[in-house]
Amino acid sequence: MSDAPRGEDAVLVAVQAALAGRPGVLTGARALSHFGEHSAGWVALAAAGALAQPAKRRSWLAVGAGAFLAHAAAVVIKRVVRRERPSHPDIAVNVGTPSRLSFPSAHATSTTAAAVLLAQTTGVPAPALLVPPMALSRLVLGVHYPTDVVTGVVVGALVGKAVGKAAGRISNSVGAEGDR
């Protein structure tokens, strides 16, 4: 008989018990996982935005760059911290992962950076719409502890803000042509 889950393991077991059995939850969480893998979905969305809205090309490219840089930052932090993914027997792992390292969640990091930059580009409150589902998906799938996800959101927000400021400075230095 296994030990009862405690701390963050208990939180994951509770989240999975409450949500994983609901229709569409695991399918949606897996879809988000595949979309966010290596920030590829955000980079593709940014490329499509740059093609569809040439007047906002630089802003859209900043979305892709920010998502990718946030992912890269998360990978570097993972390699330094080396925290293993959840492994308690009561936690169901519902998707494959590219590594055993969990801190921080690169999905939460790149999604938050992309959302911050999408909000600047589109005016839509993207962080409120995009970050919670991706963050929760990492718990439902059993591949991250809550602190992995929260830290990913914080790192992503910092990267998104920094890239947004840098992109603004670049656009301002280009002159009156704005985003072209």
UniProtKB/Swiss-Prot annotation:
Record-level GO cellular component terms: membrane
Phenotype caused by lack of the gene: Non-essential, can be deleted, but cells laking this gene show a reduced growth rate. Deformation and bulge on the side of mutant cells are observed. The cytoplasm is detached from the cell wall and possesses a discrepancy density compared to wild-type cells. The content of D-arabinofuran residues (Araf) is reduced significantly.
Main location: membrane
Catalysed transformations (reactions): trans,octa-cis-decaprenylphospho-beta-D-ribofuranose 5-phosphate + H2O = trans,octa-cis-decaprenylphospho-beta-D-ribofuranose + phosphate
Entry keyword set: Cell membrane, Cell wall biogenesis/degradation, Hydrolase, Membrane, Transmembrane, Transmembrane helix
UniProt-listed InterPro entries: P_Acid_Pase_2/haloperoxi_sf, P_Acid_Pase_2/haloperoxidase
Statement: the UniProt record of this protein carries the keyword Transmembrane helix: yes
Enzyme class: hydrolase
Assigned EC number: 3.1.3.111
Entries under SMART domains matching the protein: acidPPc (SM00014)
GO molecular function, one term: hydrolase activity
Subcellular location: Cell membrane
SUPFAM superfamilies hit by this protein: Acid phosphatase/Vanadium-dependent haloperoxidase
Membrane topology classification: Multi-pass membrane protein
Transmembrane segments: 31-51, 61-81, 116-136, 139-159
Alphabetized PANTHER family for the sequence: DECAPRENYLPHOSPHORYL-5-PHOSPHORIBOSE PHOSPHATASE RV3807C-RELATED (PTHR14969:SF62), SPHINGOSINE-1-PHOSPHATE PHOSPHOHYDROLASE (PTHR14969)
Family label: Belongs to the PA-phosphatase related phosphoesterase family.
Function: Phosphatase involved in the biosynthesis of decaprenylphosphoryl arabinose (DPA), which serves as the arabinose donor for the biosynthesis of arabinogalactan, the major mycobacterial cell wall polysaccharide. Catalyzes the dephosphorylation of decaprenylphosphoryl-5-phosphoribose (DPPR) to decaprenyl-phosphoribose (DPR).
Protein name: Decaprenylphosphoryl-5-phosphoribose phosphatase
Protein species of origin: Mycolicibacterium smegmatis (strain ATCC 700084 / mc(2)155)
